[in-house]
Structure formats: structure tokens, C-alpha cells
UniProtKB/Swiss-Prot annotation:
UniProt-recorded Gene Ontology molecular function terms: 2 iron, 2 sulfur cluster binding; 4 iron, 4 sulfur cluster binding; electron transfer activity; metal ion binding
Binding site for [4Fe-4S] cluster: 233, 236, 244, 247
Motif (Cx2C motif 2): 244-247
Taxonomy of the source species: Eukaryota, Metazoa, Spiralia, Lophotrochozoa, Platyhelminthes
UniProt free text on domains: The C-terminal domain binds 2 Fe-S clusters but is otherwise mostly in an intrinsically disordered conformation.
Name used for this protein in its record: Anamorsin homolog
Provenance organism: Schistosoma mansoni
Cell compartment(s), UniProt: Cytoplasm; Mitochondrion intermembrane space
């Protein structure tokens, strides 16, 4: 075990070493002797046990330190969110996690996974021959704990009351009636001097006797237009070849659409 990790251990620590791969018995025994000189209690667990969260023993939640990557280093590609979360559940509040990986490991990705799993203060201890890192568990951490959100205690009614009182006292509210003048309150007049139609009374504007606004000319044009016969087939102006048998314009030359045509009196007389 590296000296940088041994210096972080205390005599009252309960350490769990999570090993993986094939390890010779003498190597495991040597690691046990080396770590036992620094700590109070030591136990060994295989990494495969923590892959499934249902297989994690509740009695393992007594460790203050977890060493993962000894005696064989472990790849950061294996330390995913699920595995790191299962290892976190075995640590006491304020516990520490130490890992060792090959130098080719991606520290940025591992640091992100540690943070998302619930660890704090991820730190890189060494990267000479191996990537050795550490992370901690919050001292006030308890599994399944909950905290009230800070805005849940706010008094909404009191806040609105303060807003209303402060606005009236400082005079920040503008009275919209003071922005209107007397002329704005009068009923609008039509061009010819009579009251215009409102929403409640639908009056049609008529031209005055001495109209100068042009409304009289518009009404006269509408009356002239109403006197023009309306064609039922739309082909009266084309000529007799396109007119129906009862067309009053039969016998008259073609004319422009909309042109006023005077029908002679003898045309309307019967031939008999």
C-alpha cells in the first residue's frame, strides 16, 4: 500500500478492502499485515458483491474507510454510478473512500461519477505509477434523510400585504383617471356634426343637407349603382350569342361590364 494512503489512516478506523481479480494468498496476507498496523479493524470483500445493491449486507454499514484497488488496481471504467453508490452505503457519515487505478484512467469522468454518487471533496493523491484518489462522505449524511426546501416556510399572504402597503405609502401607483382630459371623455362626433354610432346604438351615418365632407357623393353613387340591373347569368354584356332567351338586352350590341344601358321602349313591346 502506498505511503500517501497510509498517512491518511487513523488507529480507530474500521477499514474494508474491496479486492478484485485473481490474488495470491501470500499477497493478500501481506496486505493484511501492512494495513493492520495502522487501523483498529480490517475486513476483506470481493468487488463482485457490490455490483448488485440487493446483495449488500446491512452489517457492512460500519466502515469508516474503504480501500478499493488493492492489491490489484481497478479500472475507472468499472467504477460506475451504481457501484459507487453501493460502496457509499457501507460508509459511516464522514467516512472516506480511497481508490487506485491505472495511470491511463480518466480522472475527470471518475470525479463526475463520484460527485453524482453522493461523495464530496474528490481529490487526486498521486498519479506517478497509479492514479490514487480519495473522496469523502458528508458528516451529516444519513441514508433516506430529507431536508425541507428553504422557500417552503415563506408567508405568501404577508408578502402580498407588504407589497400593497408599501405601494400606497410611497405613492408609486398612478391613477389612470388623472391622465384623461375633459375632451377625452366626450362622445365622438361624426364628420357631418352628428353623434357617431356607438356599441350600444348602431346608427347609420347620413349626409347633411349642406354636406361638405363627401358623404353625399358616396350615397349618390350607391343609389346609382343600385339602379343598374343585375345580370342573373353574367353574360348580358357579351352579346346575343351568349344571352339567355329572356334577356332584356337581346338585340342590343355588346357593352362594357357595369355600363348603364337604356333599353328603348319599343324593345319591350310585343311583336303581335
Amino acid at each position: 500500500m502506498e505511503q500517501c494512503v497510509a498517512d491518511c489512516l487513523n488507529s480507530d478506523d474500521c477499514v474494508m478492502i474491496v479486492w478484485s481479480g485473481e490474488v495470491q494468498e501470500d499477497v493478500m496476507r501481506g496486505l493484511q499485515v501492512a494495513v493492520s498496523t495502522y487501523v483498529k479493524k480490517l475486513q476483506f470483500e470481493n468487488l463482485e458483491k457490490f455490483v448488485d445493491s440487493s446483495a449488500v449486507d446491512s452489517q457492512l454499514h460500519e466502515c469508516s474507510v474503504i480501500l478499493c484497488g488493492w492489491p490489484n488496481s481497478i479500472s475507472v471504467n468499472i467504477l460506475k454510478l451504481g457501484l459507487l453508490s453501493n460502496l457509499l452505503s457501507c460508509l459511516r457519515p464522514g467516512g472516506r473512500f480511497f481508490g487506485r487505478d491505472l495511470i491511463t484512467g480518466d480522472w475527470d469522468s471518475l470525479k463526475k461519477n463520484l460527485t453524482l454518487s453522493g461523495y464530496i471533496n474528490p481529490y487526486q493523491l498521486s498519479c506517478e505509477n497509479h492514479l490514487i484518489f480519495s473522496a469523502s462522505v458528508p458528516s451529516n449524511y444519513t441514508q433516506g434523510s430529507s431536508v425541507k426546501l428553504p422557500w417552503a416556510n415563506s408567508d405568501v399572504e404577508a408578502a402580498w400585504e407588504n407589497v400593497d402597503n408599501s405601494s400606497d405609502a410611497n405613492g408609486n401607483i398612478i391613477n389612470t383617471n388623472t391622465l384623461l382630459q375633459k375632451s377625452d371623455l366626450k362622445t365622438p362626433l361624426s364628420v357631418c356634426g352628428k353623434e357617431a354610432a356607438t356599441d350600444s346604438v348602431g346608427k347609420k351615418k347620413r349626409a347633411c343637407k349642406n354636406c361638405t365632407c363627401g358623404l353625399a357623393e358616396i350615397e349618390a353613387a350607391e343609389e346609382d349603382k343600385s339602379d343598374v340591373p343585375i345580370s342573373s347569368c353574367g353574360n348580358c354584356y357579351l352579346g346575343d350569342a351568349f344571352r339567355c332567351s329572356t334577356c332584356p338586352y337581346r338585340g342590343l350590341p355588346p357593352f362594357k361590364p357595369g355600363e348603364r344601358i337604356l333599353i328603348p321602349d319599343d324593345v319591350l313591346r310585343a311583336d303581335l
